[in-house]
């Protein structure tokens, strides 16, 4: 059976790993998921990510989760735009997540950027998800 929303699956694996206090989670590889993982590293929500392979030889992304004093750094990670309902916003309409403490992941013509950077660049795009 094929997966309907691979990005939502990635977010769920991260959420489940954090609630189980895992050090690493493994996610099936795709370019967009690798880009999202690198984005989360740059924003400071996860420690690291690297491309690996599963025991079956399939490519995967190994994500090292981040904790501060035993508490997960990621309080909330949520998929917004999904295959059945895409959500696009102009730069003026981009939401502030958790009153500016969180970040919206936006797919723009300039690549994957945060809501703050999209506003600075003056570009809108598809809201991939929210992280706080």
UniProtKB/Swiss-Prot annotation:
Role this protein plays: One of the primary rRNA binding proteins, it binds directly to 16S rRNA central domain where it helps coordinate assembly of the platform of the 30S subunit.
Keyword Ribonucleoprotein: yes
Subunit structure: Part of the 30S ribosomal subunit. Contacts proteins S5 and S12.
SUPFAM superfamilies linked: Ribosomal protein S8
InterPro entries: Ribosomal_uS8 (IPR000630), Ribosomal_uS8_CS (IPR047863), Ribosomal_uS8_sf (IPR035987)
Gene Ontology biological-process annotations: translation
Top-level taxon: Bacteria
GO cellular component: ribonucleoprotein complex; ribosome
TM spans (from-to): none
An annotated Gene Ontology molecular function: structural constituent of ribosome
Family: Belongs to the universal ribosomal protein uS8 family.
Family matches, as PROSITE patterns: RIBOSOMAL_S8
Listed name of the protein: Small ribosomal subunit protein uS8
Keyword terms: Ribonucleoprotein, Ribosomal protein, RNA-binding, rRNA-binding
Pfam annotation, one family: Ribosomal_S8
């Amino acid at each position: 059976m094929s997966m309907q929303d691979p990005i939502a699956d990635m977010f769920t694996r991260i959420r489940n790993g954090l609630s189980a206090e895992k050090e690493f989670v493994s996610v099936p590889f795709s370019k967009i998921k690798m880009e999202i993982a690198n984005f989360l590293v740059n924003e400071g929500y996860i420690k690291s990510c690297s491309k690996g392979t599963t025991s079956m030889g399939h490519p995967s992304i190994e994500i090292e989760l981040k904790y501060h004093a035993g508490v997960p750094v990621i309080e909330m990670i949520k998929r917004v735009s999904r295959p059945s309902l895409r959500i696009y916003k102009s730069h003026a309409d981009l939401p502030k997540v958790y009153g500016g403490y969180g970040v919206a992941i936006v797919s723009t013509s300039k690549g994957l950027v945060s809501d703050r950077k999209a506003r600075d660049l003056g570009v809108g795009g598809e809201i991939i998800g929210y992280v706080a």
